[in-house]
Structures are given as C-alpha cells and as structure tokens.
Curated annotation (Swiss-Prot):
Gene: Morn5
UniProt MORN repeat ranges: 8-30, 31-53, 54-75
Organism per entry: Mus musculus (Mouse)
Short name of any one Pfam family annotated for the protein: MORN
Protein name: MORN repeat-containing protein 5
Distribution of this protein across tissues and organs: Only detected in testis (at protein level).
Main location, first listed in the record: other
Alphabetic keyword roster: Cell projection, Cilium, Flagellum, Repeat
Keyword Repeat: yes
Lineage: Eukaryota, Metazoa, Chordata, Craniata, Vertebrata
Superkingdom in the source lineage: Eukaryota
GO cellular component: sperm flagellum
Subcellular location(s) per record: Cell projection, Cilium, Flagellum
InterPro entries in UniProt: MORN, Morn5
Amino acid sequence: MQYTGSQYFGEYINGRMEGSAEYILPTDTRYIGEMKDGMFHGEGTLFFPSGSRFDAIWKKGLVVKGKYTFNDGLQYEDKHWHYCDSYDRRFYTEICYGLKPSGISQLTNMDPPRRIPLGYYDCGDGFYNPTTRVIKDYRNRFLRNADDDEHEWIVRTCRKGWLPMPKQKS
C-alpha cells in the first residue's frame, strides 16, 4: 500500500486482503465491500470523489453485474439510454426541476457551470490540458494521461475554457 498510495482497512488471510473491507485508492475513490484473495469479490460499491457511485457484484476483481448512479441521482441505463441525446436533450436537473426561460439556457447539468481554465477542457471528471494531455481532477490532482482516442473525444466533444467575449459598444 505504501508504494501505491492506497489504504486498506480490513482483514488479511495468508497475507492477502480478504473479507469485508474498505480500500481507498490514491484518487480518493473508495471501495467498500467484500474482498477475496486480494481482489474485489462479492458485493461492493465504488464511491467516487465526484459523489457518484458504482454498486456491483464482483468475481475475482471483475464486474459481474453493476449499476452506476451519478452524483445527482441519475442512474445510467446501458440499453435505451436517452439522456441528453437527440431524443431528449435536457439535462437531468432540467428533467427534475423544469426548463429555464428563453435566454437563460443551461450549458451543463451543473448550473451555473464550472469555470474552465483558459485553453483547458472540462471532460466530466476534471480539466484536460491538450498540450500536456494530462487530466487533473477539479481539485488539481493528477487523474490520468489521455491516450489518442480520449484526446480526440475530449477535443471534439467537451466544453473548452475561452477568453470572455468583449463587450459590444452600444
């Protein structure tokens, strides 16, 4: 644990993590559930720093069945997912609380939206610097390096931090 920055609170059997436990990753993602032979095994939940969670049944470290719930309570559906698509373009908060009047459009599910640093992209779990290809969480802690596919997706899809628009002369 000391080399990875992780923390483990639970039992050991033959030097392996086993039984009911809490495992905290360096990113502050927490797993609370069953372990067997050092792996997630049985029922367990991943709690993410963003407030979202993934409840699952695990077998030898792999997901058998799971359910992802966003921090606002929206549950992901892997079939017939119509969230914020061409079928229904509303954000979850707009579904729950209604649309705003014309001229006060909502840009993200979070309203008001998060301020994005100049030249960076908001990729959902942090800010992405396209020059260094590094994604840091919203508290400026390293999350990961983006591979070519993720870089292309972020640049094509995500909101970018721009300079404020100059005021028009009346």
